[in-house]
């Protein structure tokens, strides 16, 4: 004799079991696809940021007006407006032009001009451009540092160009929202088609 609540446990029909299995499989596939798409987009955004800052740093370092301004008694007077125009046009968060000792000639915050650059410069001082992720006065950023060469091919200044991590994250946040909407739609279609 069986003692219990008197309720009998119902078994799911084969059709219901298959439906649940299909929903789980579709859910797992949609989640995996959305996750892979997001990770791929994050890598692409980082690559794009590095390519952008590298190109802008090289362009600024090679600009004839930068060399001319560096030869004046007051480089910041000419370099600051130029750097700010390029920064706005290129869509980067900062362009810092500095002397080889790291003293800033330009900065998005004019109060920081004349202060020390925060970051690595050794590779650029050796004549090679490089990229890094560094936390400076504007927070964490993906940045490139490029040498400015004088007439005798000696390093006479450095250019650092960066995009803040928060700007990259904002781009990814928008993408994530779009991915969630698409994933939900695909999941709904997958469930409806089951």
Regions found by a protein language model. Name each.
Residues 1-11:
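Non-catalytic regulatory/interaction regions at protein termini and inter-domain linkers
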Residues 9-101:
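Juxtamembrane segments flanking the first transmembrane helix
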Residues 142-169:
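Short, hydrophobic beta-strand elements of compact beta-sandwich sensory domains
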Residues 103, 107-139:
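Extracytoplasmic/periplasmic sensor domains and loops in membrane signaling proteins
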Residues 53-56, 91-93, 139, 144, ...:
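Envelope-exposed proteins and targeting segments
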Residues 173-194:
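Cytoplasm-proximal transmembrane signaling helix
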Residues 76, 160-180:
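Helix-start (N-cap) segments at beta->loop->alpha junctions
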Residues 94-96, 132, 146:
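Generic short beta-strand
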């Amino acid at each position: 004799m069986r003692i219990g609540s008197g309720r009998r446990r119902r078994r799911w029909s084969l059709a219901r079991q298959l439906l649940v299995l299909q929903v789980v499989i579709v859910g797992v596939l949609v989640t995996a696809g959305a996750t892979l798409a997001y990770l791929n987009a994050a890598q692409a955004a980082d690559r794009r940021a590095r390519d952008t800052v590298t190109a802008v740093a090289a362009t600024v370092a090679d600009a004839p007006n930068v060399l001319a301004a560096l030869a004046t008694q007051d480089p910041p007077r000419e370099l600051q407006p130029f750097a700010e125009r390029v920064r706005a046009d290129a869509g980067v968060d900062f362009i810092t032009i500095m002397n080889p000792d790291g003293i800033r000639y330009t900065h998005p915050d004019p109060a920081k001009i004349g202060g020390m650059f925060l970051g690595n410069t050794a590779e650029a001082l050796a004549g090679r451009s490089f990229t890094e992720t560094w936390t400076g006065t504007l927070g964490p950023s993906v940045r490139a540092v490029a040498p400015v060469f004088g007439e005798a091919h000696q390093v006479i200044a450095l250019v650092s160009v960066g995009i803040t991590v928060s700007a990259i994250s904002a781009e990814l946040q928008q993408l994530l929202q779009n991915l969630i909407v698409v994933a939900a739609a695909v999941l709904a279609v997958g469930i409806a088609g089951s």
